[in-house]
């Protein structure tokens, strides 16, 4: 997602060979400039190393929770998770993406401003986390969907406030570390977090059921906050960035200009996801929601590598744009879209062949039709492409277009599910996601095309001025 890389660590990194190596291979195959390829590969390498272990442990935690809670209990657990996701999206105020954008943009050119942005983000994150966690505790009885086991579901909703609090404050720290390209530190943290989540989920689910599984999520998030906190302090010290709260009010336009549309866009999507899961639970019961949640883990596997690529290329692209490297930006963007799309398609194809065996990991009672698996994997492939194209919107200053695209995505998802859920149950939800992501690919593709045309025009004008004024 940069131009200056980690200067203070350059001495510790061997120089790349001038005419061979995997960096050159990526440059030739994708068109990404050599320097960007090497930074991309370093970032992807560290992110992949941490995420493989961390996400594998998290996936194992889901399997353990499903086996300990049973089909009905796992469906309730899935509803708690989507409810927390909707609340935390609103509480986060888009601070993760805001911090990533401005830290990656100013970390070299204006470290003082980067420190003020970090101070503003941390202050806003803690205030919002406290307010919305309290709101979740108060609203828990109304958020519990369905008549069965309502008291235990309400208690789990209230316990999830701990998870929501730390997830909210973790958002800006994760964005800051990504903006600083601290992918090695993030990788190590992901490993520790994933293993801790697995152990806590197993122990708490086995002894305390649904409430235990929910509490385990909260304790894991608290550990993640602590690890991010010390990692961010170390990175800021390394780059001479001083986090300060003096002058934060002057930087509030950054929140208005970037956080507001980012929060609005994410909130629209999160509420749609929560409503869709609740609608499926009402129409078909928690057992069917549990099946969908199990199959949804296959979607997360499809997204795994593309999300790592996107996590690395987003600050890289943002820094390139800030530095005026328009040619490098265009090549890197197109290369990242091609790379993400191809890995997503490959993963979806493999999982489509092994889908039935995958579901058996969650227990014998977890079964899903081939149609459900194929529909959700197809939707995941479109999601990969849409997420890659989204980088053109993110790097530009046009996030209100993201709000419009998410609004269309939400309308398509909700309308399609409303028309089909009563007849087709869980498969209807998968088909609704397929339709929604199809619309997003079209809209993001059009926006990316428009954005690249603008950059090409700007590059041509810059070349003309250079030639006319040597």
Residue map of PLM features:
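Interhelical loop/hinge segments that connect adjacent transmembrane helices in multipass membrane
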Residues: 23-40, 228-273, 324-327, 451-470
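Transmembrane helical elements of multi-pass membrane transporters/channels
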Residues: 42-59, 193, 197, 213, ...
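Membrane-water interface segments that mark the loop-to-transmembrane alpha-helix transition
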Residues: 10-16, 20-23, 38-54, 80, ...
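Membrane-interface junctions at transmembrane-helix termini in multi-pass inner-membrane proteins
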Residues: 165-188, 378-408
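Helix-loop junctions and terminal segments of transmembrane helices
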Residues: 93-108, 179, 237-240, 295, ...
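Interfacial segments at transmembrane-helix termini and the short loops linking adjacent helices
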Residues: 140-160, 286-287, 326-327, 353-381, ...
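Hydrophobic alpha-helical transmembrane segments
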Residues: 154-158, 187-237, 410-412, 426-451
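Signature of the first transmembrane helix
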Residues: 4, 15-24, 36-97, 133, ...
């Amino acid at each position: 997602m940069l131009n200056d890389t980690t200067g203070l660590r350059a001495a510790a990194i061997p120089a790349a060979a001038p005419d061979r190596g995997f960096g050159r291979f990526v440059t030739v195959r994708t068109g990404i400039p050599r320097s960007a390829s090497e930074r991309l590969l370093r970032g992807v390498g560290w992110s992949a190393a941490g995420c493989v272990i961390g996400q594998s442990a998290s996936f194992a935690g889901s399997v353990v929770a499903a086996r300990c809670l049973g089909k009905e209990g796992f469906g309730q657990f899935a509803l708690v998770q989507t409810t927390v996701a909707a609340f935390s999206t609103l509480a986060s105020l888009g601070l993760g993406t805001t911090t990533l954008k401005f830290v990656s943009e100013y970390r070299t050119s204006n470290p003082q401003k980067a420190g003020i942005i970090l101070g503003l983000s941390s202050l806003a994150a803690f205030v919002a986390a406290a307010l919305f966690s309290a709101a979740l505790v108060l609203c828990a009885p109304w958020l519990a969907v369905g008549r069965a086991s309502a008291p235990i579901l309400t208690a789990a909703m209230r316990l999830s406030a701990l998870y929501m609090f730390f997830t909210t404050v973790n958002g800006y720290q994760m964005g800051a570390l990504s903006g600083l390209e601290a992918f090695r530190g993030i990788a190590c943290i992901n490993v520790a977090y994933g293993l801790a989540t697995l152990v806590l989920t197993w122990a708490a689910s086995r002894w305390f059921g649904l409430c235990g599984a929910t509490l385990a999520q909260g304790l894991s998030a608290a550990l993640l906050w602590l690890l991010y906190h010390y990692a961010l302090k170390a990175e800021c010290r390394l780059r001479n960035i001083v986090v300060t709260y003096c002058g934060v009010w002057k930087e509030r336009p950054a929140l208005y200009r970037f956080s507001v549309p980012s929060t609005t866009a994410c909130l629209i999507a999160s509420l749609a996801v929560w409503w869709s899961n609740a609608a499926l639970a009402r129409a078909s019961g928690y057992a069917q929601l549990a099946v969908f949640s199990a199959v949804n883990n296959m979607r997360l596997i499809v997204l795994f590598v593309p999300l790592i690529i996107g996590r690395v290329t987003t600050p890289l692209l943002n820094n390139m744009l800030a530095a005026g490297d328009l040619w490098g930006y265009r090549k890197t963007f197109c290369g990242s879209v091609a790379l993400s799309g191809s890995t997503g398609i490959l993963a979806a194809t493999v999982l489509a062949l092994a889908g039935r065996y995958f579901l058996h990991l969650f227990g014998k009672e977890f079964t899903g039709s081939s149609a459900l698996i194929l529909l959700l994997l197809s939707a995941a492939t479109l999601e990969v492409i849409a997420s890659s194209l989204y980088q053109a919107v993110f790097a530009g200053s046009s996030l209100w277009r993201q709000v419009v695209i998410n609004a269309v995505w939400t309308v398509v998802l909700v309308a399609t599910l409303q028309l089909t859920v009563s007849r087709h149950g869980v498969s209807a939800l998968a088909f609704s996601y397929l339709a929604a992501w199809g619309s997003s690919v079209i809209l993001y593709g059009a926006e990316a095309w428009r954005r690249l045309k603008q950059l090409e025009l700007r590059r041509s004008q810059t070349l003309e001025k250079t030639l006319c004024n040597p």
